[in-house]
């Protein structure tokens, strides 16, 4: 029977734990954790993601500060906001919501964030820490996947793991975290030749290609564990994308491979909730660090 790796359920458990930590330690340090989110422009998907993060903050008792800037905001204006947040003692974590509007380069903005407040794990220093195996904030999506696999007793030691995707958000940090867990890792991407030949070797297949329904029966070996990072809104009928005439899907054709595999993350309800949960974990962890508290979350930090 195929096991469903339920990220939504686990995320709720993590939120309860974080709420308990915040309730216990806030009186001691005089304030709850604080997360600042910078959103530039009015991308609808970004609006949904930011709303989900705000709701999670409210559930666990974390202060949320939203800076919603206009589409035409200059790089210098955003840098000024980041500088102010770096110096704000109420703020433990800073997140720059991506993607940015056309004409804005994320790289100098991410570099401007204080590495100790970089709860998305995208600062050059924190990526270097990950590469060297040093402690520091980790990218939320791959970190959430690692926790989800571990909580479902899926061992990675010596396992053949294939990661499809090489983005700085997911693919590259994912591969490094898997290597640190003693997996044997192969990274595939859009230029990979004969993808099924490679993915059929995977005992654990992590798909972060950003291509709807890319992976099907021909790509998976029997009893594989499949993690589907993608989420897409596609028409139920060609050229129609209005009202309820659409469906959500991932990078994997889940129904097609379901009977062949050992376990899979659902879309929605798998990786997405874990990404938000790990953002909360990172922020609370930074709060504990800034306030001189001992970390209570080391088991959740890859």
From Swiss-Prot:
A Pfam cross-reference name: THF_DHG_CYH_C
Cited PROSITE patterns: THF_DHG_CYH_1 (PS00766), THF_DHG_CYH_2 (PS00767)
GO cellular component: cytosol
Keyword check for Transcription regulation: no
One GO BP: methionine biosynthetic process
Metabolic or biological pathway: One-carbon metabolism; tetrahydrofolate interconversion
Catalytic activity: (6R)-5,10-methylene-5,6,7,8-tetrahydrofolate + NADP(+) = (6R)-5,10-methenyltetrahydrofolate + NADPH; (6R)-5,10-methenyltetrahydrofolate + H2O = (6R)-10-formyltetrahydrofolate + H(+)
Quaternary structure note: Homodimer.
Family listed: Belongs to the tetrahydrofolate dehydrogenase/cyclohydrolase family.
Protein name: Bifunctional protein FolD
Species name: Prochlorococcus marinus (strain SARG / CCMP1375 / SS120)
């Amino acid at each position: 029977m195929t096991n469903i790796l339920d990220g939504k359920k686990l995320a709720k458990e993590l939120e309860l734990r974080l709420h308990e930590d915040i309730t216990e330690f806030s009186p001691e340090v005089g304030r709850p954790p604080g997360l600042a989110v910078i959103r530039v422009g009015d991308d609808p998907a970004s609006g949904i993601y930011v709303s989900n993060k705000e709701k999670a903050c409210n559930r666990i008792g974390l202060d949320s500060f939203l800076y919603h800037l206009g589409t035409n905001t200059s790089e210098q204006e955003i840098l000024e906001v980041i500088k102010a947040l770096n110096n704000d003692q109420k703020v433990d974590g800073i997140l720059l919501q991506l993607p940015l509007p056309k004409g804005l380069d994320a790289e100098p903005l991410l570099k401007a964030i204080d590495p100790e407040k970089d709860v998305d794990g995208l600062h050059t220093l924190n990526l270097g820490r990950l590469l060297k195996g040093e402690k520091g904030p980790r990218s939320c999506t791959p970190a959430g996947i690692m926790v989800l696999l571990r909580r479902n007793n899926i061992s990675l030691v010596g396992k053949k793991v294939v990661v499809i995707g090489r983005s700085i958000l997911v693919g590259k940090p994912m591969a490094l975290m898997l290597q640190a867990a003693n997996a044997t890792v192969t990274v595939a991407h859009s230029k990979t030749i004969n993808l099924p030949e490679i993915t059929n070797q995977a005992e654990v297949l992590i798909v972060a290609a950003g291509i709807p329904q890319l992976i099907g029966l021909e790509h998976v070996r029997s009893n594989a564990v499949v993690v589907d990072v993608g989420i897409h809104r596609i028409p139920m009928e060609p050229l129609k994308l209005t009202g309820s005439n659409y469906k959500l899907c991932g990078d994997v054709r889940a129904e097609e491979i379901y009977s062949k595999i050992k376990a899979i993350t659902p879309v929605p309800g798998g990786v997405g909730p874990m990404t938000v949960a790990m953002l909360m974990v990172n922020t609370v962890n930074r709060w504990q660090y800034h306030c001189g508290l001992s970390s209570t979350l080391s088991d959740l930090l890859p």
